[in-house]
Amino acid sequence: MLNKNYNILVTGSNGQLGSEIKELSSNYFYNFFFTDRNSIDITSKDSIRSFCQTNNINVIINCAAYTAVDKAELDELNADLVNRKAVKKLALVSQDLNIKLIHISTDYVFDGRNFKPYCEELQTNP
């Protein structure tokens, strides 16, 4: 059943994955809210909560990430803030507000040659 009142927040909308979702969104009858680091601070629970409550968000698709792998090794604090701590805050707010959260991580973890579903215990092979 299509619900035009279904509100979906997509973080990281200027990145590669967020841009793809933005492009495909016109094929669906949902209300999409595309945000970037300037429109919502995902490192702040208050910012996330306020945005979600104001816009009656039903689902969060988190595409935001610190993806500059080489730079992240030199900027560990910011990489950790975006890739771990912000995700935790999104999860906590989602849980508190009964919002579904989809978190997508895309950078260089597995080689794609496995024929079974991947799990955290598998050896990485970027």
Predicted regions and their residues:
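Glycine/Thr-rich phosphate-binding loops of Rossmann-like dinucleotide-binding domains
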Residues: 18, 69-70, 110-112
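Helix C-cap/helix->beta junction micro-motif
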Residues: 28, 55, 96-97
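Adenosine-cofactor binding site in Rossmann-like domains, unifying the SAM/SAH pocket
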Residues: 28-50
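NAD(P)H-binding glycine-rich loop region in Rossmannoid oxidoreductase-like domains
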Residues: 45-82
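Catalytic helix-loop patch of NAD(P)-dependent Rossmann-fold dehydrogenases
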Residues: 74, 81, 85-89, 96, ...
